[in-house]
């Protein structure tokens, strides 16, 4: 049991304001750049910015003290002592005060001259049904992007999964690398509105929820009968925001199938979404997907 240690108000604020990026680097944690944030290499669902953190799997977050308590499993006194420097003999720097950031405009990347790579990847590597892929392409929900490196010597091709609002305006984009060697890039385009994540609305009373766009396409390929009548959404992660938007747009819903990944983050998100759906008077059926070794996203 940790002994009681009285901390002053100044000490509490100093501990809460510790720069988490520097703190984690000093402790040997690997961080990955993700837009303006950093992600933990050991847990991609957690993002860090300054003294603040957010776990996108559990939709919880806070400042440095709560992070150290949760991530390292420490008591409040032990977390305070660690952040104030008792562990290494010196204090950690405070995070810089955040300046207001202008809203990042949402811009889809330029299209490639052909869809050759995206068709080859989705049909041959991911076994998506051609007719289903054609249907999504015709609706401009999927296309192949082509972006050049800063020095203009390289081209980068990605599959782009587009989310539209109710007026047909693109509001969200998720990019997935098409290279099959090593770890492929995936991520949401900056400025994307999570409410309008990649989705298809058929209009009936059934909704299928997935983490990744390719999971959505794979499910339809496996169960194509009457798919045009159903509703589907890929959260491009584990946030509940796209699901709430579907509830708003589809008041006729009666049944929701949660088809998230069969891992810890998927289980936690499914339970959270099921509780949310219950609050709205809807039944939720859990149908976990099994990620393949080469990454189903």
Task: Give the positions of each predicted feature.
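Conserved active-site segments centered on acidic
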Residues: 81-114
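Terminal peptide-recognition signature
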Residues: 55, 68, 122, 211, ...
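N-terminal structured subdomain of primase-like DNA metabolism proteins
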Residues: 1-91
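Acidic beta-strand-to-loop metal/phosphate-binding motif
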Residues: 209, 254-263
């Amino acid at each position: 049991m940790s002994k009681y240690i009285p901390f002053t108000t100044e000490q509490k604020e100093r501990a809460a304001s510790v720069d988490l990026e520097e703190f984690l680097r000093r402790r040997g944690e690997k961080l990955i750049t993700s837009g303006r944030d950093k992600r933990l290499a050991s847990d991609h669902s957690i993002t860090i910015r300054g003294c603040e953190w957010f776990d996108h799997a559990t939709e919880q977050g806070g400042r440095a003290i709560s992070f150290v308590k949760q991530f390292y499993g420490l008591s409040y006194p032990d977390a305070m002592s660690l952040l104030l420097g008792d562990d290494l003999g010196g204090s950690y720097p405070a995070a810089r005060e955040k300046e207001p950031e202008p809203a990042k405009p949402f811009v889809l990347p330029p299209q490639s001259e052909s869809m050759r790579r995206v068709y080859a990847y989705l049909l041959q590597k991911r076994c998506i049904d051609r007719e289903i892929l054609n249907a999504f392409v015709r609706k401009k929900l999927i296309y192949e992007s082509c972006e050049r490196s800063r020095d203009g010597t390289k081209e980068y091709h990605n599959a782009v999964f587009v989310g539209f609002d109710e007026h047909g305006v693109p509001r969200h984009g998720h990019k997935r690398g098409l290279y099959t060697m090593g770890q492929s890039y995936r991520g949401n385009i900056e400025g994307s509105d999570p409410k309008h994540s990649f989705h298809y609305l058929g209009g009936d009373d059934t909704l299928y929820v997935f983490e990744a766009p390719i999971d959505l396409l794979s499910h339809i390929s496996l169960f194509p009968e009457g798919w045009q009548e159903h509703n589907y959404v890929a959260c491009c992660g584990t946030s509940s925001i796209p699901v709430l938007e579907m509830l708003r747009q589809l008041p006729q819903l009666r049944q929701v199938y949660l088809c998230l990944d069969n891992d810890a983050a998927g289980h936690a998100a499914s339970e959270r979404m099921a509780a949310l759906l219950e609050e709205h008077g809807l039944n939720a059926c859990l149908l976990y997907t099994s990620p393949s070794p080469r990454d189903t996203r």
